[in-house]
Amino acid sequence: MVTPDKNSNGIKTVDLRTPLSSEDVLALKAGDLVSISGNLITGRDKIHKYLTEQKPDKKDIPFDLSGAVLYHCGPLIKKTEDGYKIISAGPTTSMRLEMYEASVIKEYNLKGIIGKGGMGEKTLNALKENACVYFQAIGGAGVYLADRIKTVLGVWKIDEFGPAEAMWSLEAEGFPAIVTMDAHGNDIHRKIENMSSKKFSELIGQKT
């Protein structure tokens, strides 16, 4: 669900609630500020490798990934009497998952990816083909982002992969991010890289 809003500074923020639909995703454009509430599912290297290579039956995965937002995050977790508490939940570098992401998006009908640093051409094409979107989270703000996680709903593969690499189901409220790769083929990361390369070439040319 998408709800446009403005914060106290007059900056437009799109309020999103998971699960997302294709219509929700197609309404988003690169550069949009978003606030995400609802279920977030974490997944790092081992989860992506497992989903891609082992191809588990969807009924064997305890969380519904259709319409889900997958967060590239290995949270720092504290075990409590009642369950688990998130101590830190910052994004990990997304490009390390480039080899897996396109197939995971298609196979499990993901509608959002949260991470850091953007992804490659293969993932960008998968975003367009499957109406999915990439959100850039705030790097270096793990404790701040953990405060946006209100509840740990469950965990999968913790014994096999360990806490950082397990798949966590988290209930978020007002999780901030920016759309940097949209379902229309726009990629802010690539745009900035191209602009930087052009500027660098100009500077080198001035010195020679």
Model segments located where?
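Short, structured beta-strand/loop micro-motifs enriched in basic residues and often containing a Trp
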Residues: G10-L20
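Short, well-ordered loop/turn sites that connect or cap secondary structure elements
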Residues: L28-K29
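Feature captures the catalytic cores and cofactor-binding loops of soluble hydro-lyases/lyases
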Residues: T42-F175
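Active-site/ligand-binding-proximal alpha/beta "capping" segment
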Residues: E101-S103, V179-T208
